[in-house]
């Protein structure tokens, strides 16, 4: 089965083609440089660029896969969560293509896409497994019981982890996006220099909170003269606190539920410190941890195509009434 995936939920325009779960093409056009000067994604600008980029990215994906559009068997598209204007561009394109080709359409939850990105690298992965889903907009611990049955065990009660990274990067005067900037800066810092709070880390629930940690960083920065802020040490200490919170909760969930596999998903899963610490804990606690390659952590259409492929095989599909749902939940 040849599946076309379309992803336009935020600031990446992406089209991918999979054949029975194997990637034939995965083209991503990023808008990071466009939004960098604004310090974040501007929804209207993002939507306009999706509109102009999508036909070009689509053609490139078809050419790279070396197929004709008539060979496409299924069209899979992100319908939420995300920016309403950006989502509508992808959905409208997918609907038009489905109508033109007479091929089935399936709407995919962007978060489920991130989870299912792991099937690309780990095709033998089977439920049940625990997911640490960490991105700019979402931080959740999920239990995948079946491909079409995912339970939210815990989530952030305020900022997402990626959002906290961006806000702390801004406090430190770093560029956008903040996650990679802090990751890079931390490599030259002392992670034990500042003992930042770990909100909710020892609570019985699997929920997270990062706003208090972010505020603690702000107060610490304000104690220093503007030109003498130890940015490397603050970044490293902050990053350590976030990762400890994330991993303690996730491994607790795996132990409590007697699930022996944890997978990482989402943009923050690209963080080198998180990846390293997750691997170390895996060996220490004898729980398997699967970490996606960097290109499948950030937004891409291959993950949407894979999710569509898996769910369509479960008998799930959409029709022409498919609409964008900006605040879509799992």
From Swiss-Prot:
* Top-level class of the enzyme under EC nomenclature: transferase
Q: What does the entry's cofactor note say about binding and number?
A: Binds 1 Fe(2+) ion per subunit.
Keywords, sorted A to Z: Acyltransferase, Cytoplasm, Iron, Metal-binding, Transferase, tRNA processing
Major localization listed first in the record, in broad terms: cytoplasm
Where is Fe cation bound in this sequence?
A: 110, 114, 299
Q: Which residues cross the membrane?
A: none
- UniProt subcellular location: Cytoplasm
Q: What is this protein called?
A: tRNA N6-adenosine threonylcarbamoyltransferase
Q: Which organism is it from?
A: Thermosipho africanus (strain TCF52B)
Phylogenetic placement of the source organism: Bacteria, Thermotogati, Thermotogota, Thermotogae, Thermotogales
Q: What is this protein's gene name?
A: tsaD
